[in-house]
Amino acid sequence: MKKKLNLCPKGTYDFFGQGAKIFIDVRKVFFNQAKKFNFSYIETPIFEYANIFLTTNQIADIVSKELYKFFDKSGRELALRPEGTAPIMRSVAQHKLFQTEKKFFYFGPMFRYENPQKGRFRQFYQAGFEIINYKKDSLEFQILEIILLIKSIFKDLGINEYEIKINFLSNLTTRNIYKKNLAQYFEKFSDKLEPISKIRIKKNPLRILDDKIEQEKEFVKLAPKINTFWTMEDKNIFNRITSILEEFKIIYKVDYNLVRGLDYYDDFVFEFIDTSQTLGTKLALVGGGCYNNLPTKFGLNNFKSIGMAFGIERLIEIIKSKKNIKEQNLDFFLLSFTDKEILLNFKLAKILRKENFLVDLNKTPFSVSKGFQLAKKSGAKFVFFFEKNQAKNYISLKNLQTGKNEQILYTEINFEYLNSIIKASENA
């Protein structure tokens, strides 16, 4: 079937208007918060060698079912990145960025071939924070910083309807014992499991706990819990973590079935779940945890790391539902009726933009009536224009909301005054 040229691919979208404005505002919040918490921005390629993901997430759905893979003209197998942590770890190993503890932040598009639905796309944006190569005895403080950072971001975004879920997956040895017990348990219910989960019994039964369909089944809810396999050291670590969260009055819920969707997570994991019902179901807004075994895939041993990633589209949906986001209106429209006035207004526009005012102007002369129609359609708060028989070095300034008209000295513009009238119009 011939595809229409005027449709974007399934699972993708265009940002414009209100959505684009919110996206820019959200991105600004993330960059500001990253700076406040001393995270350095890192940019990795949108595509990587496929084995970076095939090696680090062999059983995860994002590799087994959702990875966009292709071969280049030289026969190298590449993949569009489905997540941001593995590429950052590759970069850390490649550039030897591991001499001391590092704090990285990223913001960009990811790609997964999954069924598009509300809050899920095939191209989607993630913002992520990673703390790499921290000291083992500082785990609870690393977790505290991550949680406080998330709460600070949500506060700036005006998002306050969520619950925090946490779990502790222990180390590889304990987890393997737990997985063996899970497999034995789920074998008894194999006839009630989805086809993919029957495969997971042998490959990684933890994935069954993470499956949205399986989670609703009673026998899955009653499956063995990881905490019954904790060592005394695990219990002590978990108690230190919860104690420090309580010290900072952070409300959380322990969910022993929480495992996260990527294979490399261990020790502490968490999710912030939306409770606003905006997304139609309780989806994670941000999730993450420790990934101490992932660095070994890149030749980095004894390398403690923790991180998390936000789903940007989900945040945008919630922000859209919470308040009426106004389009970014111009401060001033510079209206010209002659070519000479266009040149003068270009000079004025340069001056105003230098002072951070939002400005536009017409580049073709208009009649008075059509010119003011254009100015009103632009959404500007005020319009500058030259009147007939205007006093020398003066220009007229009209408030498009009130209709008030005044004369401004063109050669000595009072920026403080302009700022005050803009602010007054926004509060009107």
UniProtKB/Swiss-Prot annotation:
Source organism, top-level taxon: Bacteria
Catalytic reaction equation(s): tRNA(His) + L-histidine + ATP = L-histidyl-tRNA(His) + AMP + diphosphate + H(+)
GO biological process: histidyl-tRNA aminoacylation
GO molecular function: ATP binding; histidine-tRNA ligase activity
Any single GO CC term annotated in Swiss-Prot or TrEMBL for this entry: cytoplasm
InterPro entries per the UniProt record, alphabetical: aa-tRNA-synth_II (IPR006195), aa-tRNA-synth_II/BPL/LPL (IPR045864), Anticodon-bd_dom_sf (IPR036621), His-tRNA-ligase (IPR015807), HisRS-like_core (IPR041715), HisRS/HisZ (IPR004516)
EC numbers for this chain: 6.1.1.21
Intracellular or extracellular location(s): Cytoplasm
Pfam families: tRNA-synt_His
Keywords for this protein: Aminoacyl-tRNA synthetase, ATP-binding, Cytoplasm, Ligase, Nucleotide-binding, Protein biosynthesis
Protein family membership: Belongs to the class-II aminoacyl-tRNA synthetase family.
Subunit structure: Homodimer.
HAMAP family membership: His_tRNA_synth (MF_00127)
Full protein name: Histidine--tRNA ligase
The organism of origin for this protein: Mesomycoplasma hyopneumoniae (strain 232) (Mycoplasma hyopneumoniae)
Gene: hisS
